[in-house]
Amino acid sequence: MSQGAVKLEVVAKGPKGTVLHARAPLVRSKPDPESYQVTGKTDNIDHRDAQDPLCVTAYVQEIYTHARKKEITTSVRPVFMESQSHINERMRAILVDWLVEVHLKFKLVPETLYLTTNLIDRYLERKEVSRPKLQLVGVTCLLIASKYEEIYPPELRDLVYICDRAYSRQDIIEMEEHVLKTLEYNVTVPTAHFFLIRYLKAGHADKKIVQLSCYLLDGTLQAYHLLHYLPSQLAAAAVFIARRNVGRNGWSPTLLNYCDYCEEEIIPVARAILQAKQSSNPELRAVSKKFSTTKYGHVTGTSIPIDF
């Protein structure tokens, strides 16, 4: 892999708890079109990784095809706040903003943040929550997601501390059991970040596109109304915007082949993401602060016009 390459990793759960890794160098600082095996007008993005067993190239596409079907049943739509008497979408946005900071402080993997948000929304879809308990639900879902995604999840005492001791260790343990029972222990869900990894690879993304796509996608987590869109649609739209912003064509035959969305389907989602970004609460700056650092390429200050 060339200097400056970035590795991203897809992890899928197989039978009996086995772990399947779809890991590959998705980003090259200087993409080399000659290195790809091309069939017709589309690239075989898995050809280079055929000898790497961790990339499960024999059935990686089947994993994503299954995920596209499953996201329909594991995603939520922005109607659940109508059944909440004590909280609203603004409070949800504040909670997610805080969780972005906590996630960064604990140095957790990106997928943990996306799974946390999914668990919160699915729980709120099923249970009414009081305002004082909302943060407890959030930190508990972070714990569950961490146990699922991380090698070393945060300790309970650290979660109690990060909540300024508003809840006890026992409160979190009891809420964990309650959340899992409510969700029928279904925590294996395809998130937007899961799809993003595949789409970045299909787009032969460079480091700038990766950072900008991640920035845009993280920003969607706070926007309650963007739950209208499926995770795969949001991921595809983030890649589309990032590609357009660095001067590439928004879409390509390879992206169409692997994402199964045409450009006309993605443009409305891309516009919704940028409109949500422009109208977001300026006080909720966790995502902006995160991506204003050198580690994330200072992409917060990137000008992203809506010109499509």
Give each language-model segment a name.
Residues 1-139, 143-308:
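Acidic, serine/threonine-rich low-complexity regulatory regions at protein termini
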